[in-house]
Amino acid sequence: MALIVQKFGGTSVGSIERIEQVAEKVKKHREAGDDLVVVLSAMSGETNRLIDLAKQITDQPVPRELDVIVSTGEQVTIALLTMALIKRGVPAVSYTGNQVRILTDSSHNKARILQIDDQKIRADLKEGRVVVVAGFQGVDEHGSITTLGRGGSDTTGVALAAALKADECQIYTDVDGVYTTDPRVVPQARRLEKITFEEMLEMASLGSKVLQIRSVEFAGKYNVPLRVLHSFKEGPGTLITIDEEESMEQPIISGIAFNRDEAKLTIRGVPDTPGVAFKILGPISASNIEVDMIVQNVAHDNTTDFTFTVHRNEYEKAQSVLENTAREIGAREVIGDTKIAKVSIVGVGMRSHAGVASCMFEALAKESINIQMISTSEIKVSVVLEEKYLELAVRALHTAFDLDAPARQGE
């Protein structure tokens, strides 16, 4: 008998019909002998609706009171699912984050989990009940309701699995696993049977929407086996684990991630003096703008060009800050480009194989795709290119690294 934590997102519980379907799935697992803790999000769109209500009162809701409002969304779904389970003869009980003492810090709207008191949950499991817990929320040391921010329900599920030492944390979504890339771009993309935490963390940070990065970090830290599954289709999904595959068939590259939300800024004619990088990026950091990739050209005539990328939503703000910096340090000009994209190859196989970056560059060159920037890590190579070439680049790389070949045995 296994202890499983199951997490269902907003689309999975987006209607009464879907909640009934989730109840059937949970019932089948319980009948198979598993002990179950089920974590739920609010119904799809409900959190936004609640935030909109708050903003009808004030443009800047008090963070503490906003947490009180938005936390009610999960209370609705946990009660409805618990009712649906009891109707089916499955003993069940629902709890809010406060009731099971998911203790967080006091950073309202973006709180971090500090500790979980698992005694109440363990007592219910011992009595044969399915425990249904509200995701996305907790309580601070003062008794105030807190919410965990983006990806919070995934994080709740993983944190509960870690506290309970669960055999597996299952994340149910609208996809049936982690794919080598987005099947909408490459129809030949394959579902991965397994992927490491390290690879998944890179893919999540690079724009993969399957799992939120905080939950992957948490799972990796506490070695919680994660499995991504489809809410309403049967299948093995994808297991995310700390163990690296030791099969001879293991590909060098596990997946290709891409991001359309990048923008590039270049400050030209910068006096080539010590500390110039700080003079440029210091004000950017002080403006709370996150920088991704950075390139500084070789100095020429005692001046240099400095290029970096930011999220497209931060482009105008970053451009304004950079133009002020350019005037202060005597740079020639600032130019920007919002029509770029980032494409990355990810795989632990890079550690033991040389020439991976060269293969990537060759595949792009064959399609006459110019590379504007390059960034590497131990298991990742990222490039920036013109946005119009994004899908062509992804397809070319998918083929070059044999990712659209027939699935390996076991998939």
Curated annotation (Swiss-Prot):
Record field: pH dependence: Optimum pH is between 7.9 and 8.4.
Catalysed reaction, written as an equation: L-aspartate + ATP = 4-phospho-L-aspartate + ADP
E.C. no: 2.7.2.4
Enzyme class: transferase
CDD domains: AAK_AKii-LysC-BS, ACT_AK-LysC-DapG-like_2, ACT_AKii-LysC-BS-like_1
General function of this protein: Involved in the biosynthesis of L-aspartate-beta-semialdehyde which is a central intermediate in the biosynthesis of different amino acids (L-lysine, L-methionine, L-threonine). Catalyzes the phosphorylation of the beta-carboxyl group of L-aspartate to yield 4-phospho-L-aspartate.
Start and end residues of each ACT domain: 265-348
InterPro entries tied to this protein: AceGlu_kinase-like_sf, ACT-like_dom_sf, ACT_Aspartokinase, ACT_dom, AKii-LysC-BS, Asp/Glu/Uridylate_kinase, Asp_kin_monofn, Asp_kinase
Cross-referenced NCBIfam families: asp_kin_monofn, asp_kinases, PRK06635.1-2, PRK06635.1-4
Pathway: Amino-acid biosynthesis; L-lysine biosynthesis via DAP pathway; (S)-tetrahydrodipicolinate from L-aspartate: step 1/4; Amino-acid biosynthesis; L-methionine biosynthesis via de novo pathway; L-homoserine from L-aspartate: step 1/3; Amino-acid biosynthesis; L-threonine biosynthesis; L-threonine from L-aspartate: step 1/5
Subcellular compartments: Cytoplasm
GO terms for biological process, alphabetical: homoserine biosynthetic process; lysine biosynthetic process via diaminopimelate; methionine biosynthetic process; threonine biosynthetic process
Keywords for this protein: Allosteric enzyme, Amino-acid biosynthesis, ATP-binding, Cytoplasm, Kinase, Lysine biosynthesis, Methionine biosynthesis, Nucleotide-binding, Threonine biosynthesis, Transferase
Protein name: Aspartate kinase
Pfam family, any one: ACT
Induction: Repressed by L-methionine.
Activity regulation note: Allosterically feedback inhibited by L-lysine and L-threonine individually and also subject to a concerted feedback inhibition by these amino acids.
